[in-house]
Regions:
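Conserved P-loop NTPase-based nucleic-acid remodeling module centered on helicase motor cores
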Residues: 1-95, 99-102, 106
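A short beta-strand-to-loop transition that corresponds to the Sensor-1 phosphate-sensing loop
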Residues: 1, 21-23, 179-183, 220-221, ...
Length: 306
C-alpha cells in the first residue's frame, strides 16, 4: 500500500499520507495513549489460558469435564471465545442466551462460565489481539482524528473491535469506506455481494447514531480492469445481457469463454477439457491455473476430473 501511495502521489504529497491496518493503527494509538506494553496472547497462549480457566473453576466444570485435559478442546474453546468476542458477545450475554427457551443450557451455560473466567485471568496477564483494537478505540483522544480524511478499502466486514474504532472516527473525521457491491445496499439477497450490502447498512446506521450525514457514491467506471479490457467487457456483459461489446471477438481464439453448466461436475469437466486442449496446443501446465470460488464445494469434482 505504501508503495502504491508513493507511486500515485510522489515525494511531496505522500509525506502527508499514512497507511495503517486496524492492528497497526491500534498499536500507534496504544503507544501514544498507553497500553502498548501489555503483552498479546498467541494462539497457544489463549489455549493455555482456557486450560487455566477450567482449572480455576474446578468442580464447576461438569458438561466439559471429560474434555478439560484435552489440548484440542482447549484450542477449540479458545477459537470459540475469539469468535464470540469478535461478534461483541460478552460472557454475561452468552449466559443470558443459555437460559433462553430452547437453548442448550448445560453446554452454553458452562461455556459462558469458562468464557468469564478466561476474561478474568486475561485481565491480569495480557490482551487478546482483538482487545488491543478495542482498547485503542476507547482510550484515544478524538483530537487524533480531528480534521483528518480517512479512507478504508479492501474490507467486506467489520467485527466488534473494528466497529468501535470506526465509531471513534465518525464524529471528527471525514471517513470514506469503499465496498465492492453490485446493487444498492437496501436490496437484500444471498448473493456474492450480500455481505457488502449488510456492511453498508451497518455503516449507515452507525453514522445516523452519531448524527453524521452519510452520502452514497456509486462508481460506474471500471478502473480495476483498465489494463484488462476483456475482463471489463465481460463485467459489462454480465451486468447487462443486452450490452454490445466494443471489441471484435475472434471465435477461434476468445480471450474468455463463458460456460453455463448444469452442475459442478459439468463445470469441472468443461474446465478439464479446456486445460487439456491448451496443453495439446503447447501451453505448459505450470502456466495454467484452476480457480474456484469455494474450494470445499468443488474439490471432489476437480479431483475426479483432473
Amino acid at each position: 500500500t505504501e508503495g502504491a501511495l508513493y507511486h500515485a502521489l510522489g515525494d511531496e504529497l505522500s509525506a502527508y499520507v499514512e497507511s495503517y491496518s486496524f492492528t497497526s493503527l491500534a498499536e500507534t494509538l496504544l503507544r501514544r495513549y498507553g497500553g502498548a506494553a501489555v503483552p498479546t496472547l498467541s494462539e497457544a497462549g489463549r489455549a493455555v489460558l482456557v486450560r487455566r480457566a477450567m482449572d480455576e473453576m474446578m468442580d464447576k466444570v461438569v458438561y466439559y469435564s471429560r474434555q478439560r485435559r484435552s489440548a484440542a478442546f482447549c484450542q477449540k474453546a479458545a477459537e470459540t471465545i475469539s469468535e464470540l468476542k469478535s461478534a461483541g458477545i460478552r460472557p454475561e450475554t452468552l449466559a443470558d442466551y443459555a437460559n433462553a427457551p430452547g437453548a442448550d443450557k448445560d453446554k452454553l451455560g458452562e461455556l459462558a462460565l469458562i468464557f468469564g473466567t478466561y476474561e478474568t485471568l486475561l485481565a491480569q496477564t495480557a490482551m487478546d489481539p482483538g482487545d488491543r483494537v478495542e482498547l485503542a478505540a476507547k482510550s484515544l483522544d478524538q483530537a487524533f482524528f480531528a480534521g483528518r480524511t480517512v479512507y478504508i478499502d479492501e474490507f467486506d466486514t467489520f467485527n466488534h473491535s473494528k466497529r468501535a474504532m470506526l465509531a471513534a472516527m465518525l464524529p471528527v473525521a471525514d471517513v470514506t469506506v469503499s465496498l465492492c457491491c453490485d446493487q444498492a445496499p437496501d436490496l437484500a439477497d444471498d448473493g456474492v455481494f450480500s455481505g457488502a450490502r449488510r456492511v453498508a447498512n451497518t455503516l449507515k446506521s452507525m453514522a445516523a447514531s452519531a448524527g453524521v450525514p452519510c452520502k452514497e457514491i456509486r462508481l460506474t467506471q471500471d478502473m480495476r480492469h483498465k489494463d484488462a479490457p476483456v475482463l471489463a467487457e465481460l463485467g459489462l456483459l454480465l451486468a447487462d445481457p443486452t450490452y454490445t461489446p466494443e471489441a471484435e471477438v475472434d471465435p477461434a481464439a476468445p480471450a474468455i469463454t463463458y460456460y453455463k453448466a448444469d452442475s459442478r461436475q459439468a463445470e469441472a469437466k468443461a474446465v478439464a477439457a479446456a486445460v487439456k486442449a491448451r496443453a495439446r496446443a503447447g501451453v505448459p501446465y505450470n502456466k495454467m491455473a484452476v480457480i474456484c470460488r469455494t474450494v470445499d464445494q468443488y474439490l471432489l469434482q476437480v479431483r475426479y476430473e483432473f
